[in-house]
């Protein structure tokens, strides 16, 4: 792959999108969303085919392995009361140990170190919290919860009572149905503060049909946080750093991928977070996929050589986002922008509740592989 200097400029990943194409409601059934299939015919460049997510079943073959992110979205948005009776919104990001959590606050200027605040429910139950400090890197606050709620799994019951599902700001509503619809059907490990949105397209019927075709699946965990959804701001991307996110790739996933390779199958990632999980595990093993658990801040951008992932199902992402860099690493930035233009012309729906893009193994640039 020839690297263009423009590949490392944030402005090169901008595009115009009419707000009418930002999906406000999910498609039902899930697998009925549109899918832009990116592939390549012999002797020709990339081609785009307009399908539905259900049609992905016909593009896969027995022996392939679909790898998914099983993180579960927490009800991470909280309204808390200050001593003077006014309210501030907290957005939980990640645990910091001993019941302390990093939170974004809105408006943050109202919260100072030492302040006492209260979570309250409609049942008039109240739980006191305390602002410990400001976090310089994020502009957020370190908030002391009761020490019992020291990790993602332990705090989930509390958030079920006091919190709300953290829909992205471009979705201009909140509905009870989002409690279930903003989760993948296989979400099982609590900890994300945003959904791994490619997986939202996979219905129970789709997963059953997958199994009947002899296509296996495996689950990794990446708790989606700032590293995935925070907008990029620096124009020079050469030394880009992302906020770290917690990842686990278990031994059973490693075994499933090795078996897939042995039978000549292909590894298809469901979502960019799955790509980052697998590739980070591969790099941590010095070029050998091994079980991995820990924080990951891997940046995938043009020039990256993929060691594990052969194909990708993903959504259409926000302008100037790190996710566009990752997809560009697979198919090239100019190809990506051309495909996005076609999707816009064809009125595809964008972002979290929007339509999908499937980059088949044939559509991946040869130079993007090890």
Swiss-Prot record:
Its main location: cytoplasm. Its EC number is 2.4.99.17. Pathway: tRNA modification; tRNA-queuosine biosynthesis. InterPro entries: QueA, QueA_dom1, QueA_dom2, QueA_sf. GO terms for biological process: queuosine biosynthetic process; tRNA wobble guanine modification. It is found in: Cytoplasm. It catalyses: 7-aminomethyl-7-carbaguanosine(34) in tRNA + S-adenosyl-L-methionine = epoxyqueuosine(34) in tRNA + adenine + L-methionine + 2 H(+). PANTHER family: S-ADENOSYLMETHIONINE:TRNA RIBOSYLTRANSFERASE-ISOMERASE. NCBIfam families: PRK00147.1, queA. Belongs to the QueA family. This is S-adenosylmethionine:tRNA ribosyltransferase-isomerase. It comes from Prochlorococcus marinus (strain SARG / CCMP1375 / SS120).
